[in-house]
């Protein structure tokens, strides 16, 4: 298998504020978390784990021969859960890169994960995250995060507002992060910052502390499931692609 020095970690906490037991919600006959895992597993990376506090989630993943790491339900964020899981990986001294994939993207493309890894390994950024070019109409129809970048693609700021103001094309931020090991260790040691708390975006803690985030372009905006309405959209999308035999 490729990229033996990379760990993919999918944090999946059973409790959810906006959608009850979100990872266990069905899309077709398969749970959300199983769909995410199966998509990511197509990248064919040996060190792929689901980090969870739930026996139910663990059983689902183990039935499809996935690897599970148990983490405390009190862990506050997905990044913290990712780090706690990383510390429990056997022989983790051989892992130099960690990719955090949110457990709410049931149709995420495995190529996006591989692109993050390649970009991270061939750059000097502390962290790499994917973005998609979208028009104003697309981004206004959602509650998504946009990012402003410099000419080299280095992230300057992330916001829940449309940035840059007045533009007609934006960079939609996809919720995946590739960390160098030392960058992940540094991140979890830092306290939440003013901008992070104001925007409710963890990645601003990185920028406020002088660390760097590189962006890599991917083609498609993945469906994220956070609410009942999102779940309905995901089910509808699945039904449509099933009819097409995809």
From Swiss-Prot:
Cellular component, GO annotation: cytosol
Protein name (record): 3-deoxy-manno-octulosonate cytidylyltransferase
Pfam family name, one: CTP_transf_3
Native organism: Rickettsia akari (strain Hartford)
GO BP field: CMP-keto-3-deoxy-D-manno-octulosonic acid biosynthetic process; lipopolysaccharide biosynthetic process
Reactions this protein catalyses: 3-deoxy-alpha-D-manno-oct-2-ulosonate + CTP = CMP-3-deoxy-beta-D-manno-octulosonate + diphosphate
UniProt cross-references to NCBIfam families, sorted A to Z: kdsB, PRK05450.1-1, PRK05450.1-5
Keywords from the UniProt entry: Cytoplasm, Lipopolysaccharide biosynthesis, Nucleotidyltransferase, Transferase
Role this protein plays: Activates KDO (a required 8-carbon sugar) for incorporation into bacterial lipopolysaccharide in Gram-negative bacteria.
Disulfide bonds: none
Predominant cellular place of this UniProt entry's protein: cytoplasm
Annotated metabolic or biological route of this protein: Nucleotide-sugar biosynthesis; CMP-3-deoxy-D-manno-octulosonate biosynthesis; CMP-3-deoxy-D-manno-octulosonate from 3-deoxy-D-manno-octulosonate and CTP: step 1/1; Bacterial outer membrane biogenesis; lipopolysaccharide biosynthesis
GO molecular function annotations of the record: 3-deoxy-manno-octulosonate cytidylyltransferase activity
Localisation: Cytoplasm
Family, as annotated: Belongs to the KdsB family.
The enzyme's E.C. designation: 2.7.7.38
Record field: transmembrane: none
Top enzyme category: transferase
